[in-house]
């Protein structure tokens, strides 16, 4: 198949060979302007053609294209008599063509990433984020620490032990009643006490998301820790009340400055929110499943239409992400297809928790359970929605998380991971500051948000299994879903 992206000038066509999957859908009760396109097959466009893309440059040279809502509200299943009749070109070529945006329409301001030198650096796994210098000791066992792993300063041994324990959901039993004093010797003798000490010292399962806790963030964490230690030491040494007061005032001012967005970060956030808010699901799709009760087959068709709208929203939002169209076109496709499932579930979680009228969440769950989808997949889906709801996320956090999901540098088939990471890092920095601003009493809120992204990754597997069962039962999908999910 060929995915066709078009811009303001000449369309660009790219073959899609990457395999992905999915579906987990919740309607959104907002109406939008209809668009005119989607991903479909096309006869032309060799993969090896010269795409004439500009090389990656920092955000001060990245255009912020004008955002226009382009979501279709029409139905693919019009021939079944279940939906209103729509024009035949509803899924014609061109709706989902990504095109280069002219630089003159873009935002020319600088962000923090533009101040960083564009140099090569080694890739870091999430667990090894934040290398350190000196002879710091592991807070768990006292061995020499290698860096900040899962939110705590630990050695390589405790990092690996914590990762294995969480991944395998391991349950250990202490022979001494849980009273072991953890050190380099005892860490090999008592796993229960070692895991408990890991958690007591701040290690978080939520941080096990590849690429999100970057070296920059860990440096910021150490900087804040050093400033706090310095402030405490100065306060203890000073007997003068006036000097104590000046120190406290200075420290307070520093902390306040660190939790305010810079002008460039605010501009970036405003742009992301403008793009995010202009992509909404047609209201009539919501009304279908909430106002009437249908057969399992009809419910499945409605859910398929919802999924199609979600993918349309994803493509339009992705096209507008700052810097996205400076990436290699094959990387653009890999990011889009790789994030389709996770972005859909994340948007659905927002709708489920914030957009549905009172009492409709339970009704929606009931209708989806009657669509023929196995409870094996539905139960974790709604558990995820509810766990996200418990975090009391703002719309800004939903929008930034969605952008972070899309710009994940560890997707399969990505050729230039460093370029993708450079686009993702400013979004992570903004999200981290917002967490401190909105929930200052909860210092772990940022880590909890990243933990939801870890949970999202599991839905790729669930969705692949769902697709397999649907294909066995000969369920049909729209051309866009077949393209984005690689359904033959």
Swiss-Prot record:
Cross-link of type Glycyl lysine isopeptide (Lys-Gly) (interchain with G-Cter in SUMO1): positions? 133, 291
PTM Phosphoserine: at which residues? Answer: 146, 165
**Knocked-out gene: effects:** Elevated serum bile acid, cholesterol, and triglycerides, increased hepatic cholesterol and triglycerides, and a proatherogenic serum lipoprotein profile. Reduced bile acid pools and reduced fecal bile acid excretion.
State if Electron transport is listed as a keyword: no
**PTM N6-acetyllysine: at which residues?**
168, 228
Zinc finger (NR C4-type) residue numbers: 138-158, 174-198
Tissue specificity remark: Expressed in liver and kidney. Expressed in pancreatic beta cells and macrophages. Expressed in the villus epithelium in adult ileum, with highest expression in the intervillus regions. Expression in colon is reduced by inflammation.
Q: What does this protein do?
A: Ligand-activated transcription factor. Receptor for bile acids (BAs) such as chenodeoxycholic acid (CDCA), lithocholic acid, deoxycholic acid (DCA) and allocholic acid (ACA). Plays a essential role in BA homeostasis through the regulation of genes involved in BA synthesis, conjugation and enterohepatic circulation. Also regulates lipid and glucose homeostasis and is involved in innate immune response.
Q: How does it assemble?
A: Heterodimer with RXRA; the heterodimerization enhances the binding affinity for LXXLL motifs from coactivators. Binds DNA predominantly as a heterodimer with RXRA. After activation by agonist binding interacts with coactivators. Interacts with PPARGC1A, SMARCA4 and EP300. Interacts with NCOA1, NCOA2, CARM1, SETD7, PRMT1, GPS2, SMARCA4 and MED1. Interacts with XRCC5 and XRCC6; decreasing NR1H4/FXR transactivation activity towards ABCB11/BSEP. Interacts with PAGR1 and NCOA6; indicative for an association with an MLL2/MLL3 complex (ASCOM). Interacts with NR5A2.
Implicated disorder: Activation protects mice against cholestasis, development of chronical intestinal inflammation and fibrosis. May suppress intestinal tumorigenesis.
The name this protein carries in UniProt is: Bile acid receptor
**Source species, please?**
Mus musculus
